[in-house]
Regions:
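Membrane helical hairpin/interfacial module
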Residues: 31-32, 37-72, 77-84, 88-89
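A generic, well-ordered mixed alpha/beta core segment in the N-terminal half of proteins
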Residues: 75-130, 137
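Short, well-ordered coil/turn elements that cap or connect secondary structure elements
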Residues: 23, 54-56, 104-106
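N-terminal basic/disordered segments at the start of proteins
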Residues: 1-26
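Alpha/propeptide regions of enzymes that mature by internal proteolysis
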Residues: 50-54, 58, 135-146
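Generic structural signal for well-ordered, non-membrane alpha-helical segments
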Residues: 5-13, 37, 41, 45, ...
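Residues at the starts of beta-strands that form the adenosine-phosphate
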Residues: 27, 58, 108
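Conserved small/polar residues in nucleotide/adenosyl-binding loops
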Residues: 149-151
Length: 151
């Protein structure tokens, strides 16, 4: 395994074990945009799938078309996400529907690494729990600041 693959595997471990709190044997649905949209790296979903499978996850790929005006996820997607333990969006749709209640049945992850190099970078392998702790600290500071500011 070369250095790139080691980092990519570490990033997938970070996504699946730290962020998703998954375990080997869990099902993982990877929702990805069809080839030709060129927003996400065309190999990213396969790279993640290969490492997830090697880590013991049962992976299913779910290709979608990008729709800039999406109003609701398809019935097929809702059914697929409902039956998976974890859903990883390697698609802009994840951000478009992340607050919808009809897709809240499982653990959703939205990848902001849009290409293989970003996934296998320091960003991709940075400890997810560390980012969560940083987010909590920043939110607490903002809430304290808002209570002290009078407009």
């Amino acid at each position: 395994m070369d250095q790139f693959d080691k980092k990519a595997r570490a990033a997938v471990e970070n996504l699946l074990f730290q962020c998703a709190e998954g375990t080997p044997g869990d099902t993982l649905l990877i929702v990805h945009e069809n080839l030709g949209h060129d927003y996400y790296d065309a190999n990213l979903h396969r790279l993640i799938s290969n490492h997830a499978t090697a880590l013991g996850f049962l992976v299913e790929l779910f290709p979608i078309e990008f729709d800039p005006d999406v109003k609701a996820p398809s019935a097929e997607l809702i059914k697929a996400t409902s039956s998976a333990d974890h859903t990883l969006f390697v698609a802009r749709l994840g951000d478009q529907i992340r607050f919808r209640t009809d897709t809240q049945n499982n653990n959703k992850i939205i990848s902001y690494a849009i290409d293989s190099d970003t996934l296998a970078s320091e960003f991709g392998i940075a400890d997810y729990k560390g980012f969560e702790a940083l987010k909590v600290t920043i939110n607490n500071l903002m809430m304290k600041a808002l209570s002290l500011i009078h407009i």
